[in-house]
Amino acid sequence: MEQALKQARLAFDKNEVPVGVVIVCRLNQKIIVSSHNNIEEKKNPLCHAEIIAINTACNLISSKNLNDYDIYVTLEPCAMCASAISHSRLKRLFYGASDSKHGAVESNLRYFNSNSCFYRPEIYSGILSEHSRFLMQEFFQRIRSAID
């Protein structure tokens, strides 16, 4: 999760919502992909950290199934990202801070408990959540102060 937090800080420095991700091979515990939100730079609402990481990992291993991999995310995934995690069959999802507004794992939609869920990973929440939460608060305070 510390590496995912480093990615979130990179996003923060680029004025992106500070969400970071790493995908880790379960067999050797090596990070195969790291990413962060890139929506503003790419001018593309699909460039969430999780989507970028999953796409890169699938291309890297030439497979749509990531069942030998885990994903670490600094913020609870939204519905789009939860669906991508499900469809790529990532074995385990570890995330930091909950997202009471857009979270789709345990906060709002609870995608993995829905009938439309394709596959449910093992889910572990609250990992270094205070660090993720602080970074998000700092980011949005900066945004609000720029508006004022």
UniProtKB/Swiss-Prot annotation:
PROSITE patterns to which the protein is assigned, alphabetical: CYT_DCMP_DEAMINASES_1 (PS00903), CYT_DCMP_DEAMINASES_2 (PS51747)
Q: Which residues form the CMP/dCMP-type deaminase domain?
A: 1-116
Family assignment from sequence similarity: Belongs to the cytidine and deoxycytidylate deaminase family.
Q: GO molecular function: any one? A: zinc ion binding
Q: Name one GO biological process term.
A: tRNA wobble adenosine to inosine editing
**Entry annotated with the keyword Chaperone:** no
User: What does the organism's lineage look like at the top?
Assistant: Bacteria, Pseudomonadati, Pseudomonadota, Alphaproteobacteria, Rickettsiales
What enzyme class is recorded for this protein? hydrolase
Name under which the protein is recorded: tRNA-specific adenosine deaminase
> Keywords, A to Z?
Hydrolase, Metal-binding, tRNA processing, Zinc
Tell me where the transmembrane regions lie.
none
Keyword field contains Metal-binding: yes
Q: Which cofactor does it need?
A: Zn(2+)
List the EC numbers from the record. 3.5.4.33
Q: Which organism is it from?
A: Rickettsia prowazekii (strain Madrid E)
Whichever gene encodes this chain, its name is: tadA
This enzyme catalyses: adenosine(34) in tRNA + H2O + H(+) = inosine(34) in tRNA + NH4(+)
Q: Cofactor binding mode, per the note?
A: Binds 1 zinc ion per subunit.
